[in-house]
């Protein structure tokens, strides 16, 4: 894998300044102006990039009341379904090209975590400069392969992965001629107990 990767006009390497990514996620609360304000706050705080997530409720889960699709882990969303949660959490696709333009005018790199093959196609039309692979997608090899084929840098989280999963994902990228991969150490618990982080 390459030791030096360009994301926009930012060089990512061991001796480069830290590349700071602000995650918007669902914090816009389905309000476009709030999304823009979040990007401005990120820029004002010194972020280099803003990251969103690209999915719809129907591309990420099933509209189903089955117990497997109910939220019951003692959160503020208990009693709702995943589909209903994602209806209030996703970033509308019609916003995304507009948000990208505004972010770039602010001097931010704008990119996303796709969650299915159609969202990769959509982000390619938007010409995002880099992709973020969420921990829960690292073992979806057709998905990894499609992202790798774009030739763009890939930031890949490893939260639920075994070493074999990480090796397979990296090998898949390499097979597609893409060695611009950055691995992130991730603890897939929200919030993560400090004892799970293994940080010294």
PLM features per residue range, with description:
Residues 142-194:
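Conserved anion-binding
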Residues 37-53:
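Catalytic domains of carbohydrate-active enzymes, especially glycoside hydrolases
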Residues 76-135:
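Active-site beta->alpha loop and helix N-cap motifs at the rims of alpha/beta catalytic domains
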Residues 20-22, 50-52, 110-112, 131-133, ...:
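Hydrophobic faces of well-ordered beta-strands that scaffold small-molecule active sites
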Residues 21-34, 86-88, 109-111:
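Active-site mouth loops of central-metabolism enzymes
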């Amino acid at each position: 894998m390459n030791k030096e990767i360009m994301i926009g006009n930012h060089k990512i390497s061991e001796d480069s300044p830290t590349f700071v990514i602000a995650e918007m996620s669902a914090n816009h609360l389905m309000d476009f102006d709030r999304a823009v304000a979040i990007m401005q706050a990120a820029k004002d705080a010194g972020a280099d990039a803003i990251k969103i997530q690209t999915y719809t409720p129907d591309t990420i889960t099933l509209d189903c009341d089955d117990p497997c699709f109910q939220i019951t882990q003692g959160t503020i969303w208990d009693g709702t379904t995943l589909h209903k949660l994602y209806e209030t959490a996703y970033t509308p696709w019609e916003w995304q090209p507009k948000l990208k333009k505004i972010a770039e005018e602010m001097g931010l790199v704008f990119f996303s975590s796709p969650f299915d093959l159609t969202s990769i196609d959509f982000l390619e039309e938007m010409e995002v400069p880099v992709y973020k692979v969420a921990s829960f997608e690292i073992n979806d090899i057709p998905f990894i392969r499609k992202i790798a084929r774009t030739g763009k840098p890939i930031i890949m989280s490893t939260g639920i992965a075994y070493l074999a999963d990480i090796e397979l994902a990296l090998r898949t990228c390499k097979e597609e001629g893409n060695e611009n991969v950055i691995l992130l150490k991730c603890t897939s618990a929200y919030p993560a107990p400090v004892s799970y982080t293994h940080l010294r």
